[in-house]
Design a protein with these regions (language model features):
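Extreme N-terminal starter segment of soluble prokaryotic enzymes
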Residues: 1-5
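A short, Lys/Arg-enriched amphipathic alpha-helix followed by its capping loop at the start of a domain
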Residues: 20-28
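Helix-loop-strand module that forms the ligand-binding subsite of alpha/beta enzymes
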Residues: 34-121
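Long, highly hydrophobic alpha-helical transmembrane signal-anchor segments
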Residues: 124-125
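Short N-terminal binding/cap micro-motifs at the start of the first secondary-structure element
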Residues: 12-18
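A Lys/Arg-rich helix-loop hairpin that forms a DNA/phosphate-binding surface
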Residues: 31
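Conserved small/polar residues in nucleotide/adenosyl-binding loops
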Residues: 128-130
Length: 130
């Protein structure tokens, strides 16, 4: 069994959260970067014995369309998966539901979901003067 991180993290915040969570799971880790527009995601075949973490940010309360489309190309084969939605300055609204729909279509078995708060990527705390 190995841990597979499927991550869409254009600014690195979601990746940090994913690594923190997956780092608690004791196994070898493989990362699939959904930000790579040129990658052939259909080449990834996940084993039912693998544990998968799917992480992406919430953009305006929605899952990024590019991330969802790329996720749908990966064969989940019944592997257990945890969804992680990372959001900053507002609510995550439908993001987890959209991630769940895409993961199920890809053949993953959703076991848990996490909504994690991270620093807002457009307006980092270092730029806010209070």
């Amino acid at each position: 069994m190995k841990t597979i991180e499927i991550i869409f993290s254009p600014t690195g915040g979601t990746e940090k959260v994913a690594h923190i969570i997956a780092g608690r799971w004791a196994s070898d880790t493989v990362t699939i970067d959904l930000c790579d527009a040129k990658a052939d995601f259909s080449q990834w075949v996940i084993s039912k014995e693998d544990q998968v973490l799917i992480a992406m940010p919430s953009f305006g309360g929605r899952a990024p369309a590019a991330a969802i489309e790329r996720l749908k190309r990966i064969a989940g084969n019944g592997a257990a998966c945890t969804l992680v939605c990372v959001y900053g300055n507002r609510a995550y609204e439908d993001t987890l539901a959209e991630m769940e729909d895409a993961a199920k279509q890809s053949g993953f078995q959703i076991k848990a979901a996490v909504a994690a708060v991270a620093e807002h990527s457009i307006l980092p705390l270092s730029l806010i003067h209070i």
